[in-house]
Amino acid sequence: MAIHLQDFAPPQELIPLHPVYQVQDWDDAAGAIDWPRLRASLKNVKEHGALPESHYSHDHLNEQKEIPVPPETTGRWTKRFKDVSDQWSAKGFNVVWALVDGFLLYWDSEVVDALDVKIFLCIPEKVLKQRRHERHGYHTAVQSDPEGSLWRDPPHYWEQIVYPAYVRAHEHLFENGDVEGGKLAPKYEKELVLLSGEGCDKHMGMGEMVDIAAQSILSVSDP
């Protein structure tokens, strides 16, 4: 099951204005996500293995890029997860793995506590900026239309709003607040699995990242 943090953004008309630049601020953690709804949804997944019936995703409206994973990696982990699922089934349980994907996962303490495995993909600012630019916009929810509307960043939105908000939301995870290439703060060294993505000095390949992530998930999945 994939749970997209972006689906928990408030309706467009409820997004607050930035106090300095007077444009809607979709990225400041406090107002970018409907945190009570996300917490309740994760609780529902934990208790019932499913999102609430009222949940609606508009992620399918956004541009989807294929991320190639080595076939041998996919095959190996597909078998491993199936084996674990079968072991749970033999004991009368239906195991559900829920992957929560998002840009602000480690800001809200209640959300953090709900996650059994915490993985952070570290990407330098220049790559983040390029990816944001290449998306050409985001589909967002509005109260009158569940299909949402398309948001496009106005000029200088990245420099003035997006990246400063990203730093504020993640600096507590790293020593000296260095979100670019810093070490994890002692509090998070054992709690957070750190992956080095595109543009990092020690860039991991996709196969290696999948291996680390999958092994971390299975480490808490033993029947």
What are these regions (language model features)?
Residues 2-4, 118-120, 191-195:
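Conserved beta-strand scaffold positions in the cores of enzyme catalytic domains, especially
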Residues 41-49, 134-141, 173:
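Conserved AAA+ ATPase "sensor/coupling" helix adjacent to the nucleotide-binding pocket
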Residues 93-95, 134-138, 160-223:
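NTP-dependent small-molecule kinase module
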Residues 107-109, 114, 142-151, 156, ...:
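C-terminal regulatory/interaction module of P-loop NTP-utilizing enzymes
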